[in-house]
């Protein structure tokens, strides 16, 4: 089983990214579970979505703290609150304009800086696509399932008028993740 965690603040689309990933895994014949945690604030409150993906049945619907393989963070307060769930040596991708890991964190985890929000805003031209940029990043780092099936599930989840922008966002997420890994 692969355990992923996306964290940010309300309004950044982290829950949507989790829904797309878990739905894509189910459509692919596997098991996908999404468990979200967020405050009552509509925008701005800490948000977390844990995604469990497996080819075998998942018997417990929550991520195991300290065993998460991959985390993506777009807000400092959420990063600080939820980072300890990532296993030693696990991968954490941060939005460097908003999240600043301390030196100790860089020793515990493999941390990559990818400007997800800037990519969505400046290269896609629509900041709302940041969750899809994040989706592409997560897929490139984890390879948890067929990337084309995730792309298709994502395109099925967005309105027609924004399909092209979201497809570009997904591709840019993959591209930047490849570059970050070297």
Predicted regions and their residues:
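Active-site cofactor/cluster-binding pocket
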Residues: 1-182
């Amino acid at each position: 089983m692969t355990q992923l965690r996306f964290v940010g603040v309300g309004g950044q689309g982290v829950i949507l990214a989790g829904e797309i990933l878990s739905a894509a895994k189910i459509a692919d014949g596997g098991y996908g579970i999404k468990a979200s945690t967020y405050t009552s604030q509509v925008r701005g409150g800490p948000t977390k979505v844990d995604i469990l993906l497996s080819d075998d049945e998942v018997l417990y619907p929550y991520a195991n703290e300290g065993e998460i393989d991959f985390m993506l963070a777009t807000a400092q307060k959420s990063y600080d609150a939820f980072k300890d769930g990532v296993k030693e040596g696990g991968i954490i991708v941060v939005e460097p304009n908003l999240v600043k890991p301390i030196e100790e964190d860089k020793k515990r985890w493999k941390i990559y800086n990818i400007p997800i929000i800037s990519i969505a805003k400046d290269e896609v031209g629509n900041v709302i696509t940041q969750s899809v940029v994040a989706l592409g990043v997560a897929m490139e780092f984890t390879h948890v399932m067929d990337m084309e099936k995730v792309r298709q599930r994502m395109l099925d989840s967005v309105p027609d008028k924004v399909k092209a922008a979201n497809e570009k966002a997904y591709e840019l997420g993959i591209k930047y993740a490849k570059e970050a890994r070297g």
